[in-house]
Curated annotation (Swiss-Prot):
The keyword Calcium does not apply. This is Adenine phosphoribosyltransferase. InterPro entries: Ade_phspho_trans (IPR005764), PRibTrfase_dom (IPR000836), PRTase-like (IPR029057), UPRTase/APRTase (IPR050054). PROSITE patterns: PUR_PYR_PR_TRANSFER. GO terms for biological process: adenine salvage; AMP salvage; purine ribonucleoside salvage. It is found in: Cytoplasm. It comes from Thermotoga sp. (strain RQ2). One of its GO terms (molecular function) is AMP binding. NCBIfam families: apt, PRK02304.1-2, PRK02304.1-3, PRK02304.1-5. Catalyzes a salvage reaction resulting in the formation of AMP, that is energically less costly than de novo synthesis.
Length: 170
């Protein structure tokens, strides 16, 4: 199945000059969504890890589904003020601004192996912040899996030395 045909391009969103890759048509189609999750799981079948870590909002959708299918725990990473317990955070640059990512301070035990999952790999800034959060808590990132990669932004330069997997490349 060509999953790319389920990704909608939204020009000038969230600001002028940005082409937003909207995955909601893929999520709405049960066959495409199932295919995407199955194929993302296949990308990491040979990796040994304990937890799937994913950021809100669309990362939750993919990450939680993958964690369920792979029989792993799921750790949500959220924006400021959204998690109820004590957190640690990292600040990072987006394609269109600055943001913070927070994780519960006890979400990852020292030495646990982690798969990071998100919907889009754009500049690599979010992924870098997620890696720093995992390391801050004593975890080890074994791989990163993304539904979409915007290769023209060269995000892999920021993730050198990490195993990066993507399904759909622009």
């Amino acid at each position: 199945m060509d999953l790319k045909r389920f990704i909608r391009d939204i020009p000038d969103f969230p600001q002028k000059g940005i082409v937003f890759r909207d995955i909601t048509p893929l999520l709405r189609n049960q066959e495409a969504f199932k295919e995407a999750i199955d194929r993302m799981c296949e990308l990491v079948f040979d990796k040994e890890f304990d937890l799937v870590v994913a950021p809100e909002a669309r990362g939750f959708i993919l990450g939680a589904a993958m964690a369920y299918k792979l029989g792993k725990g799921f750790v949500p990473v959220r924006k400021p003020g959204k998690l109820p317990y004590k957190t640690v955070y990292e600040e990072y640059q987006l394609e269109y601004g600055t943001e913070q990512l927070h994780i519960h301070e006890d979400a990852i035990e020292k030495g646990q192996k982690v798969l990071i999952v998100d919907d889009v790999l754009a500049t690599g800034g979010t992924a870098e912040a997620l890696i720093r959060l995992v390391k801050k808590l004593g975890g080890e990132v074994v791989s990163l899996a993304f539904l979409v990669e915007l290769s023209y932004l060269e995000p892999r330069k920021r993730l050198e030395g990490y195993d990066v997997k993507t399904l759909i490349v622009y």
